[in-house]
């Protein structure tokens, strides 16, 4: 098991000791003009994102709208990634944001600083970029973000964490994954689509405090359309388990394995769900 360490003329409230505060604006900030607008589909996303398009595609990317704004020599960018559903948008947001640092008074869930704001609303993952991090431009960035987000439908997705994860997980650690790229920063179970998610079947994971002092375990749950598909994924994982993971105890519906560092993991089949727990100190 390989765990990897893991907006310009509006008068707005500026920086506070506890973080950035803002006042929502309704229109494009005075003086700023749209200088460029481009759209990218699934077929040409690689032309914009060099080396990182795959994970967007795995989470259900559909279309990117890129808008650049200028004021003299200054520039701000807006990137709107339309995903196939709210779960996909939340998934890529959580994957990119990591531990969130939200701005106060912002209209949607977000994480950011003066360089970049990440946000998610409905089926859209949004990036608002202040490339040089200039503090005087931050009010204009907020204004552009508020304007862009106001036009996005607020579709409500399923609360998968409440549905699938037991209570008690550590705040800020919950993630969604739809394939190996979303899971890879946490654990490598094997090559390719090892859990047979096909880019459509959702998994959730989060960290929990383990029974040992200072121990942090991770629980992942993948919910399949049927028990038969869950069993097929279970069998595929058993047959193609990463060579760094040593099988210890195996039955028809469970597996205990050990990684190169001596930590344990478990895999169990429960109806149409696979449950994986790893980074366990003792079994």
Regions found by a protein language model. Give the residues of each.
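Soluble, non-membrane globular domain cores that form compact, hydrophobic packing
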Residues: 6-8, 12-283
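Positively charged n-region of N-terminal signal peptides that target proteins for export
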Residues: 1-5
């Amino acid at each position: 098991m390989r765990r990897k360490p893991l907006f310009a003329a509006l008068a707005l409230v500026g920086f506070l000791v506890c973080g950035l505060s803002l006042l929502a604006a309704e229109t494009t900030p005075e003086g700023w003009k749209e200088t460029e607008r481009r759209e990218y589909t699934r077929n040409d996303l690689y032309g914009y994102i060099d080396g990182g398009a795959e994970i967007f595609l795995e989470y259900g990317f559909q279309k990117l709208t890129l808008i650049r704004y200028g004021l003299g020599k200054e520039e701000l960018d807006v990137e709107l990634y339309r995903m196939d559903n709210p779960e996909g948008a939340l998934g890529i947001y959580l994957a990119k944001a990591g531990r969130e640092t939200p701005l106060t008074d912002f209209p949607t869930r977000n994480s950011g600083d003066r360089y970049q704001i990440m946000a998610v609303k409905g089926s859209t993952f949004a990036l608002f970029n202040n490339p040089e991090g200039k503090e005087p431009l931050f009010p204009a960035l907020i204004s552009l973000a508020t304007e862009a987000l106001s036009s996005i439908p607020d579709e409500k997705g399923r609360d998968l964490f409440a549905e699938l994860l037991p209570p008690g997980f550590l705040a800020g650690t919950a993630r969604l994954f739809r394939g190996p790229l979303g899971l890879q920063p946490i654990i490598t179970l094997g090559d390719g689509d090892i859990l047979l998610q096909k880019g459509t079947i959702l998994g959730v994971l989060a960290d929990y405090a383990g029974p040992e002092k200072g121990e942090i375990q991770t629980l992942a749950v993948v919910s399949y359309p049927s028990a038969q598909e869950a069993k097929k994924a279970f069998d595929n994982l058993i047959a193609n388990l990463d060579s760094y993971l040593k099988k210890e105890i195996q039955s028809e519906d469970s597996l205990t394995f050990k990684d190169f560092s001596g930590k344990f993991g478990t895999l169990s089949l429960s109806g149409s769900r696979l449950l994986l727990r790893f980074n366990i100190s003792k079994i």
